[in-house]
């Protein structure tokens, strides 16, 4: 947090903590005089994502899809005990596509995280590359496309049944 404090005037931080860690995190920022909006839970994620230049987050499927839909640069920290390592796999896919950075829980230290954050802030073109790659992964019409595929399959099946009748 000391590196954050040194550059605190360059940053606008929103930190979702969950109920359990709220007081400790809020106190840590206050102790270093870092102005951060610390909240147990965020609402209106599309608005929050649109506001952010960099999102530091877990790597659940919904989060990865929201990052892609928002077209935002992300640093993924997959939950290490997620079932079948699905968060790690999601983060690896985003990383391979150039749509995010990846720090495993085993590698996570305050220094590593702040290094990744400032690496991006110091190279705005890297933020843009990650954002563009994330946006390219977005499937905003996925529900419609799935419905179309189901209808297409149903029509093929109905046509086969008519042909054999």
Give residue ranges: language-model regions:
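C-terminal alpha-helical cap of glycosyltransferases
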Residues: 139-165
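A ubiquitous structural signal for well-ordered alpha-helices
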Residues: 3, 116, 130-133, 149
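Two-component system phosphotransfer/interaction surface
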Residues: 109-122, 147, 151
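Donor-nucleotide binding loops and adjacent catalytic segments primarily
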Residues: 1-55, 88-92, 96, 103-113
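A donor-sugar binding/catalytic signature common to diverse glycosyltransferases
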Residues: 45-87
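Short, small-residue-enriched loops and turns at beta-alpha junctions
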Residues: 15, 81-84, 110, 137
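Catalytic machinery of carbohydrate-active enzymes
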Residues: 115-118, 126, 143, 159
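A short, well-ordered alpha-helix in the C-terminal region of glycosyltransferases
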Residues: 126-140
